[in-house]
Amino acid sequence: ASEIKVTLGQIRTIKVHVMGEVVKAGTYSLSSFSTAFYALYHAGGVNDLGSLRNISVVRNGKQIAVVDVYDFILKGQSKGNISLQDGDAIIVPPYHSLVEVDGNVKRPMFYEMAEGETLNTLLGYAGDFTGDAYRKSVTVTRKNGREYQIHTVDDDMYSAFALVDGDKVEVGRMIERFENRIEVKGAVYREGVYQLSENINTVSK
């Protein structure tokens, strides 16, 4: 009869340096199967000043990967979450641009914006408009270092309007008013609310 022998060896450990804007920076002993996300978890995660978009994995003095947590959270992509090797360093820099979106979007909160991203990108991160949002324009409040500025951005400029650190985007609600509604009451066969159009402009119709 055939015999199969299985030997279970000890999993090799590696030392990984986690530096920068994390809760507990330091050198960690991890299993050789560890990834960048796992190392960040052991360091307590990114702190309030840290970037979630531009985390570097450095090996032998060279950057070999960039971790963008948004790619994983919002798109399910984990291309930067590579397997680590002994001596690797994970460096979390401060965030570059943090903006707030408030009002009638599905996920109103602060978002970190990467270089080249626009107002349209931010609306995508925020889950897009709610059903009762006013979509034709939004209001951006910006700090210029001395005072505040207001920018009214129309919808045809969403994909071109670049946001800067400290911007606040406010999405309003539709006005509760109808553009083509008429209500008929009194001595008619059917009272009610009807559509008003170019072809219907008298009660008899």
Language model features with spans:
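Ser/Thr/Pro/Gly-biased, low-complexity, turn-/loop-rich segments
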Residues: 1-205
